């Protein structure tokens, strides 16, 4: 699935941002743990200049667990444009972690956060409280068609 998103650090207070976001359709608040993995033997899953071109993620979202393979696309200047993601649900977080380890993937980073999700007609808007890093706002549009200009979609966001 092709998605286009914009992620920015939030400098305002959480309650001030939530007051503004509450005019949209509130979907819910979820605790999310993301563990990103890399493979020392595969160039695509190694950090390059502080960026990943591809990554493998294990996510715990409330009581559900998911594995995701994500491919990021960048413009000629190295600016992230969009991602393609393949994701599926898995049952057992602990067993999945062991399988990933047996495959030789190494944990790169863990991101522990609380996500407040809102919807509009076109966008998913998420206020993220990231442990140790602060507040972030993500605005995402999914299901981008092949004929749409990614830069124009991103500019509209």
Placement of each model-derived feature along the sequence:
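General beta-strand recognition
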Residues: 66-68, 126, 138
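Residues forming anionic-ligand binding surfaces in small-molecule and nucleic-acid pockets
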Residues: 70-72, 132-140
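An amphipathic alpha-helical core segment
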Residues: 124-132, 142-144
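Active-site ExK catalytic segment of metal-dependent nucleases
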Residues: 7-9, 138-142
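A short local loop/turn or secondary-structure capping micro-motif enriched for an aromatic residue
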Residues: 75-78, 134-136, 146-147
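Mixed-charge, glycine-accented linear interaction segment located at domain edges/termini
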Residues: 146-157
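N-terminal strand-loop-strand beta-hairpin
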Residues: 1-122
């Amino acid at each position: 699935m092709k998605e286009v998103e914009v992620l920015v650090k939030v400098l305002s207070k959480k309650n001030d941002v939530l007051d503004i976001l509450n005019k949209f359709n509130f979907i819910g608040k979820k605790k999310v743990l993301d563990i990103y993995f890399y493979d020392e033997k595969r160039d695509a899953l190694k950090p390059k200049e502080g960026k990943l071109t591809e990554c493998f993620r294990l996510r715990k979202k409330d009581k559900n667990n998911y594995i995701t393979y994500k491919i990021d696309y960048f413009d000629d200047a190295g600016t992230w444009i969009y991602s393609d993601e393949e994701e599926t649900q898995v049952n057992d977080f602990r067993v999945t972690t062991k399988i990933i380890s047996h495959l030789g993937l190494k944990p790169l980073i863990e991101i522990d956060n609380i996500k407040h999700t809102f919807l509009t007609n076109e966008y998913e808007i998420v206020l993220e409280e990231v442990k140790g890093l602060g507040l972030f706002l993500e605005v995402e549009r999914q299901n981008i068609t092949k004929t749409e200009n990614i830069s124009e979609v991103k500019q509209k966001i």
